[in-house]
């Protein structure tokens, strides 16, 4: 809610205290929170000054640490897209994190799922905020695929046609993240310091449109 409201009010560079400002550590929740943070204006963990509330990603369990590392790497790899999207926000005042009703306000479903948003023009995210079950900690999230576009799962490349809703289940290491078809997603190889390292290699992911697929 605060992210959506800040976008409505023109405060686009909004971040969260990943892991929680207070309260006991919850490694699974922190992983899911980090997945959301990777598609936010700023990705950071934070808490009040208390040694008992240590939020460093590498002090969680081995699996949780690996899952969070994957998200930090993904954020680094997406930096060309993030940079372009931030420049677009600066130039047009269209939010970086966009509630669905900004682009699809004519459809009532755009107002129904508070967990779903657009990150720039091409990425549709629906982060999971419920605990998982089983050894893989699988959790589900309802996702609406809007418009007449075709959407592709960022992790598996599975295709979903627009105009439908699906219940998506994901293990701890993944979350519902989709790329709009008919566009090219600019990325780069992982680098530990993406903000200060000059771009030398551009990776282009091409996603066919509905007519080309």
For the regions a language model picked out, list residue spans one by one.
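Catalytic-domain carbohydrate-binding cleft regions of carbohydrate-active enzymes
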Residues: 4-174, 179-180
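Accessory, solvent-exposed terminal regions and/or long lumenal/extracellular loops of proteins
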Residues: 172-213
């Amino acid at each position: 809610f605060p992210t959506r409201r800040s976008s409505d009010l023109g405060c686009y560079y909004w971040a969260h205290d990943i892991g929680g400002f207070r309260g006991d550590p919850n490694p699974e929740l922190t992983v899911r929170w980090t997945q959301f943070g990777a598609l936010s204006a700023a990705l950071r963990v934070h808490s009040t000054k208390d040694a008992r509330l240590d939020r460093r990603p590498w002090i969680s369990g081995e699996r949780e640490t690996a899952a969070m590392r994957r998200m930090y790497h993904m954020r680094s790899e997406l930096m060309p897209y993030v940079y372009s999207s931030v420049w677009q926000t600066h130039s047009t005042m269209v939010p970086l994190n966009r509630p669905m009703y900004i682009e699809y306000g004519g459809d009532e479903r755009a107002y129904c799922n508070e967990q779903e948003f657009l990150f720039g023009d091409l990425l549709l995210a629906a982060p999971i905020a419920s605990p998982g079950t089983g050894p893989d900690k699988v959790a589900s999230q309802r996702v609406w695929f809007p418009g007449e576009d075709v959407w592709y799962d960022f992790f598996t490349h599975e295709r979903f046609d627009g105009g439908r809703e699906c219940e998506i289940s994901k293990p701890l290491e993944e979350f519902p993240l989709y790329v709009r078809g008919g566009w090219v997603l600019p990325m780069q190889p992982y680098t530990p310091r993406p903000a200060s390292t000059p771009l030398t290699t551009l990776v282009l992911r091409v996603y066919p449109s509905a007519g080309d697929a």
